[in-house]
Amino acid sequence: MIILETRSLKYSYPDGTAAVQDINIEIKKGKKVAFVGQNGSGKSTLFLLLNGTLKPQEGEILFHGVPFKYDSKSLREIRKSVGIVFQNSDDQIFAPTVYQDVAFGPANLGYSKERVDACVQSALEYVGLIRLKDRPPHHLSGGQKKRVAIAGVMAMEPEVIILDEPLSNLDPVGADEIMDLLNEFNHFGSTIIISTHDVDLAYRWSDYVFLMSNSKLIGQGTPAEVFKEQELLKKVGLRQPTTLEIYHEIERRGLAYGRNSPKTIPDLVNTLKPLDLMWVDVAPGVREGDNLNIGVMYGEYATQSPYEAINATVLHIHPNGRAIVELKRKGIKAGGVLLYDTDKYSPDEVRQIIKEGEIAFVGAMGKKSKTLAEQDGIRLDVTSGVIDKSILMALCGKRCLILTAGGMVDHALKRTREYVDKSGIEFTVGVVNRDGGCKWLEETEGSPEKLKT
């Protein structure tokens, strides 16, 4: 379903500078969309048009197929449904306290005092700032101000959230927290639209990319489609994403499997084609290209796990009856990624899981989970890029625990299971405290073994 659409959109500033020229786009509901381009390419002006802050001089914008109207009542409905977070949070935050700033939008929509309070409390809880609700915004850090601005938009319960350069002026930890929030909003159905000149962010995060230059739309498609066009990227002063650049170099050297375009470091690692050959005796009648079950290897013959089930493809058969085969290994006992929902948090339970589950690597996603771990002295090995780093550790046979909450639990579960399905590399994935019980599942030889507390 198309939620936002523009038709032949044009806008120029009073001095005659063309900011948006003949823009035609369709944005699907529930997608993560990135507008990519250098500063001055027209992204920010387009966002102000999509929110009804500016009115186009030509063309039209449609929300759920209905053209925008620019009377006061219609604009109020548009801005309730299509929220915008500016690049500079100071341009958006003006009230004496955090609570009052977040309450401004719902109050302006005519909500009752009780509903305004419920919306504000919920939004501040969601972004992890409820304890700062009475603090003046100018006393906050850059990352906290950004979260206040996001909470102000969230409190109006929009279907679409637009963010202009959402990670500008944020440190890596603050940036990771903002992206966790955006992923959670999207998980619950919100359409998320961002502008950025960071090609690495757009490539790994978005479902769909629009490429802008000199106030025009010059390309669009999936991240893999857009960022493979090296000549187009050079034309607008952008480079290929680092992960894709490394993959193409690996592919040119014949060291990569398949023709997928990896988005993340675990995806990239999974494309590597190891040289794993062996001489084996084969039975009469075996032909080149046949698949063989070699059995289980261990000790010095198992290179990735303590015990490995080995299948092999016959590459060449020698006249003496021996063959060169390419080995395909599968660890019988691999690591795993375990998720703990901190909405049901117990520090003693977490410590017991870490001890009895032999957890070697602990991460936390979201401000709430990080704060809980820190205040209770629970060791955190990683607080940014948590999902990818946990997958990499699981591939090395380590058991990992991710502390998170809300929609990020299902988001992390989905991301990790997608990796397992796509890569074909099996390791345990699950939520440890869902449905009232603590469970660590070791899926070995088809018989789950459960650790319960």
Swiss-Prot record:
ABC transporter domain residues: 4-239
InterPro entries: AAA+_ATPase (IPR003593), ABC_transporter-like_ATP-bd (IPR003439), ABC_transporter-like_CS (IPR017871), ABC_transpr_CbiO/EcfA_su (IPR015856), Co_trans_ATP-bd (IPR005876), ECF_ABC_transporter_ATP-bd (IPR050095), P-loop_NTPase (IPR027417)
Gene Ontology terms describing biological process: cobalt ion transport
Keyword Transport carried by entry: yes
The enzyme's E.C. designation: 7.-.-.-
Subcellular location: Cell membrane
Membrane-topology annotation of the record: Peripheral membrane protein
GO terms of molecular function: ATP binding; ATP hydrolysis activity; ATPase-coupled transmembrane transporter activity
Keyword Translocase: yes
One Pfam family of this chain: ABC_tran
One GO cellular component, as annotated: ATP-binding cassette (ABC) transporter complex
Keywords, in A-Z order: ATP-binding, Cell membrane, Membrane, Nucleotide-binding, Translocase, Transport
Residues that bind ATP: 37-44
Enzyme class: translocase
PANTHER family on file: ENERGY-COUPLING FACTOR TRANSPORTER ATP-BINDING PROTEIN ECFA1, HEAVY METAL TRANSPORTER
Family per similarity comment: Belongs to the ABC transporter superfamily.
Protein purpose: Probably part of an ABC transporter complex. Responsible for energy coupling to the transport system.
Identification of the protein by name: Putative ABC transporter ATP-binding protein MM_0462
Gene source species: Methanosarcina mazei (strain ATCC BAA-159 / DSM 3647 / Goe1 / Go1 / JCM 11833 / OCM 88)
